[in-house]
From Swiss-Prot:
This is Dermonecrotic toxin SpeSicTox-betaIIA3i. Dermonecrotic toxins cleave the phosphodiester linkage between the phosphate and headgroup of certain phospholipids (sphingolipid and lysolipid substrates), forming an alcohol (often choline) and a cyclic phosphate. This toxin acts on sphingomyelin (SM). It may also act on ceramide phosphoethanolamine (CPE), lysophosphatidylcholine (LPC) and lysophosphatidylethanolamine (LPE), but not on lysophosphatidylserine (LPS), and lysophosphatidylglycerol (LPG). It acts by transphosphatidylation, releasing exclusively cyclic phosphate products as second products. Belongs to the arthropod phospholipase D family. Class II subfamily. Gene3D superfamilies: Phosphatidylinositol (PI) phosphodiesterase. Expressed by the venom gland. GO terms for cellular component: extracellular region. It is found in: Secreted. InterPro entries: PLC-like_Pdiesterase_TIM-brl (IPR017946). The active site is at 5, 41 (nucleophile). Mg(2+) binds at residues 25, 27, 85.
Length: 275
């Protein structure tokens, strides 16, 4: 999975897909009551990027629905995963539940269309800190109350704050979640980051019987040397400001027979087992 990073304006969606991304990450900004208003990162953000691009959240969902709906004139078959970077750290953790209700409702109304020809992409809920776990409970509660639990099959969870992996597992256990989990490891592209925690996450992923990390990705990679380092370790995904650079690295002899781009036929919740 090549995740285009910080794809917050509607016109950027096709731009990043044209560069080779098959997944996009966008920032969801909330008001003080936990209502998702905009896809917007704000200042500061990654080096070399414009931090202020944005769209109205519901309009953005309407657009990516078209891009991920077969038969729609805007359909792009390569876009298979949407990662919502939920900016919950900007609001009180008491509002995390309200935020979960709001995001689930907006996805039902604007993306899934409550079963009426909605978008098909998988959804990854990127939650900054384990203290905001009530968001997940609220999201699942809302799908159940609205009679649309079938969409749970399309939704995954990812804690992105580089917290202790065992603490994350404990929170997932508390929530009763042991499926559809990704684990991110990384830092803004402005700073270097070692591989200690990334290696630990990959080790857990590869431990037989360990359910809490089937997929691991590294972010935000801009240098080809760091992309190669992550691929050598065996990550499932790379988030980058430059998807075309990732595509180039994947074509190199060292990687071309080990990796391929994920398609809609690949289940993002299953641990990859080499043949």
């Amino acid at each position: 999975w090549i995740m285009g990073h910080m794809v917050n304006a509607i016109e950027q969606v096709d731009e990043f897909l044209d560069l080779g991304a098959n997944a996009i990450e966008f920032d969801v900004d909330f008001d003080d009551d936990g209502v998702a208003k905009y896809t917007h990162h704000g200042i500061p953000c990654d080096c070399g990027r414009l931090c202020t691009k944005y769209a109205v959240f519901t309009e953005y969902l309407d657009y990516v629905r078209q891009v991920t709906t077969p038969g729609d004139p805007k359909f792009r078959k390569e876009l298979v995963l949407l990662a919502l970077d939920l900016k919950l750290q900007r609001i009180s953790s008491e509002k995390a539940y309200a935020a979960g209700v709001d995001v689930a409702t907006k996805l039902l109304d604007h993306y899934w269309m409550r079963g009426w020809n909605g978008g098909r992409a998988y959804i990854l809920l990127n939650i900054p800190l384990v203290e905001d776990y009530e968001f997940i409970r609220a999201f699942k509660d809302t799908l159940r109350k609205e009679g649309h639990e079938q969409y749970n099959a399309k939704v995954g969870i990812n804690f992105t704050g580089n917290e202790d992996l065992d603490e994350i597992r404990e929170v997932l256990e508390k929530l009763g979640e042991d499926e559809h989990i990704w684990q991110a490891d990384g830092i803004t592209s402005c700073f270097p980051r070692g591989t200690e925690r990334l290696k630990k996450a990959l080790e857990k992923r590869d431990t037989p019987g360990y359910k809490y990390i089937p997929k691991v990705y590294a972010w935000t990679l801009v240098r080809s040397s760091i992309m190669r380092r992550s691929l050598r370790l065996g990550v499932d995904g790379v988030m980058s400001n430059y998807p075309d650079s990732v595509v180039k690295v994947l074509k190199e002899k060292e990687f071309s027979d080990k990796f391929r781009l994920a398609t809609y036929a690949d289940n993002p919740w299953e641990k990859f087992t080499p043949i």
